[in-house]
């Protein structure tokens, strides 16, 4: 077995860059035949068919119109898909795993990669769901249980995995959370200018100024995320921008492929 680690600029990037970087690593190896990924629908054929339709000129025009209405990209894609392709295609975009699957398929196509996609049906909790009592818990639910020191967190992991986590907790290196770094992050962000923020990946339309004002007034990361978020700029996007700013990741980093 071989485990490849996706470097930080791409591991905390938007779905498009995350998928492109991961697929490019596998493609560069020259020996990978199959790319499997979690999926809410579990149908490789349906995902491939819909992915091709999402790239149509009609869909692009419809998407542009939705974005011009001030919608976020995820919401705009879902609305455009419903208008151009029907409710079934729009429903696929509601699933976090299926939405990411489309980016994997797009990356495979752009690289002319011979790697074949394989969708694996996701069972149990949905992505980021924390209240699921049956089936496999989500990663978000497991993290929440561990942060609460809930014994159910240990039961949610294989014993060998939890032993590694227990060792890191004992050493003071885990669990990692925004709250543990909040003061350091806010302190660093307050030293940045709008020009610095303009260099961040996935920033546009003067968002750096809104982020800058939020940084100056917010007293916590939670309040920063809330005051910068709008209908167009999602909570997830603001969190990514904040993390990139703290780590010094710029557009120039994510525009490249992983080494």
Each language-model region and where it sits:
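Active-site cores that bind ATP or allylic diphosphates and position pyrophosphate for catalysis
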Residues: 5-259
């Amino acid at each position: 077995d071989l485990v490849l680690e996706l470097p930080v600029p791409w591991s905390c990037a938007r779905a498009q860059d995350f998928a492109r970087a991961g697929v490019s690593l596998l493609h560069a190896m020259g020996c990978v035949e199959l790319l499997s990924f979690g999926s809410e629908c579990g149908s490789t054929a349906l995902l491939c068919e819909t992915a091709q339709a999402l790239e149509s000129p009609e869909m692009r025009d419809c998407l542009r119109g939705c974005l011009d209405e001030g919608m976020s990209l995820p919401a705009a894609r879902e609305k455009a898909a419903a208008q151009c392709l029907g409710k079934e295609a729009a429903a696929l975009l509601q699933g976090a795993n299926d939405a990411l699957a489309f980016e994997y398929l797009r990356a495979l196509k752009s690289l002319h990669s011979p790697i074949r996609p394989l969708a694996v049906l996701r069972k149990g909790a949905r992505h980021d769901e924390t209240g699921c009592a049956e089936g496999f818990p989500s990663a978000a639910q497991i993290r929440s249980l561990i942060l609460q020191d809930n014994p159910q967190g240990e039961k949610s992991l294989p014993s060998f995995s939890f032993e590694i986590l227990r060792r890191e907790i004992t050493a003071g290196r885990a669990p990692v959370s925004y709250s543990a770094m909040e003061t350091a992050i806010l302190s660093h962000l307050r030293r940045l200018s709008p020009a610095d923020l303009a260099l961040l990946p996935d920033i546009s339309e003067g968002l750096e100024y809104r982020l800058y004002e939020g940084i100056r007034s917010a007293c916590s990361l939670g309040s920063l995320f809330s005051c910068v978020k709008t209908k167009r700029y999602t909570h997830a996007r603001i969190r990514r921008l904040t993390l990139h700013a703290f780590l010094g990741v710029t557009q120039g980093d994510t525009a490249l492929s992983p080494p």
